[in-house]
Regions:
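Positively charged n-region of N-terminal signal peptides that target proteins for export
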Residues: 1-4
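Bacterial N-terminal signal peptides
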Residues: 6-14
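N-terminal active-site segment of His-dependent metallophosphoesterases
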Residues: 18-106
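Short, solvent-exposed loop/turn elements at domain surfaces
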Residues: 27-29, 37-44, 186-189, 216, ...
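Active-site glycine-centered loops adjacent to acidic/histidine catalytic or metal-binding residues
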Residues: 34, 95-96, 133-134, 210, ...
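Extended active-site neighborhood of metal-dependent phosphoesterases/phosphodiesterases
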Residues: 51-56, 101-204, 224-237, 244, ...
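Short acidic, glycine-rich surface-loop motifs adjacent to enzyme active sites
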Residues: 200-218
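Histidine-centered catalytic micro-motifs
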Residues: 208-213, 243-253
């Protein structure tokens, strides 16, 4: 598991805020993907039993992963934050902190509190900046729990007095992090994203969101995949502001660079669902990026 976390750290080390010529300070940020923190007691099992595939994932996967790997994984995260050099200035989490699917409003509140209790237990001593994931708002009462439990905790952990939504910015050192919520019904969300990026004097700019901007596997999952106009606008904003995309959702590790008419976009996609701490070498490595994703996996229909 140490090696798994080292991979995440090494990805960010290459993006450290420093320049020897300008004698700037070296800093690091620890990047986490989906976690899907899950305790069986946080589910209405009668409700969940009506959804066989969700029941399987909860009982056979995420609750098991949480029990078997989260205690050690969280200790490693805490240790890296304390000892890693250059020093880690923040932990960045790309959404799906919890599994969701609690089954009732009461259980949704309970699940949200359990997830943040797990984060608090790490006692990180640095900002914990997170974005909204689809599982964080899935199930009866989940959206209300996000408003009531998630947003106050997100504000506290990131060092903000309060948050009205999952669209917010945090600046640390010379680095800007803009959390973007594509599910927000605010029609001016993209304009606000552009304003946040353009209005910052930070040298390094990151856009944090759960779903990838650039699809990287045969499922072709990416934000705004059913809204070409918004997708083009998002690509233009990110590329023109030379921002780097940080995302998750696919439970994969990926680094890609895509050319657009407005410039290149670099995207880093990570995963923190640890199924087996003893798997230290990737089983499948894809070095070429192109349309062969679709033809190589005909069983998948791109969405």
């Amino acid at each position: 598991m140490n090696k798994i976390l080292f991979v995440l750290l090494s990805l960010l080390t290459s993006l450290q805020s420093y320049s020897q010529e300008q004698n700037e300070k070296e800093v690091s940020f620890l990047l986490l993907g989906d976690i899907h923190y899950d305790l069986l007691e946080d589910h209405d099992m009668e409700w969940l039993s009506t959804k066989p595939d969700d029941l399987r994932q909860v009982t056979k996967e995420y609750s098991v992963f949480t029990k078997n790997t989260w205690p050690e994984f969280s200790r490693i995260i805490s240790g890296k934050v304390q000892k890693h050099q250059p020093s880690i200035k923040a932990v960045l989490q790309m959404g799906d902190l919890s599994e969701g699917l609690a089954g009732s409003p009461q259980k949704a509140i309970q699940m949200a509190n359990s997830a943040f209790k797990a984060v608090n237990k790490m006692n990180l001593k640095v900002p914990f900046i997170m974005t909204k994931g689809n599982h964080d708002i899935t199930g009866p009462g989940a959206k209300e729990a996000f408003e009531k439990v998630y947003l106050p905790n997100m504000a506290r952990l990131a060092g903000h007095p309060s948050l009205q939504s999952a669209n917010y910015t945090t600046t640390l050192e010379d680095v800007l992090f803009v959390c973007y919520d594509p599910w927000d019904r605010n029609p001016e969300g993209l304009q606000q994203l552009e304003k946040s990026l353009a209005g910052s004097k930070a040298t390094y700019k990151f856009v944090m969101l759960h779903e990838p901007v650039i699809p990287v596997n045969e499922r072709c999952w990416h934000v705004f995949r059913q809204d070409n106009a918004k997708r083009e606008q998002l690509l233009q904003i990110i590329a023109s502001q030379q921002a780097i995309v940080l995302c998750a959702h696919l439970h994969l590790y990926s680094v890609v660079c895509r050319d657009t008419p407005w410039g290149s976009i670099v995207q880093i996609l990570v995963n923190s669902v640890i199924k087996d701490k003893n798997i230290l070498v990737p089983k499948n490595v894809v070095a070429d990026y192109g349309p062969e994703f679709v033809t190589a996996h005909p069983q998948w229909q791109p969405s």
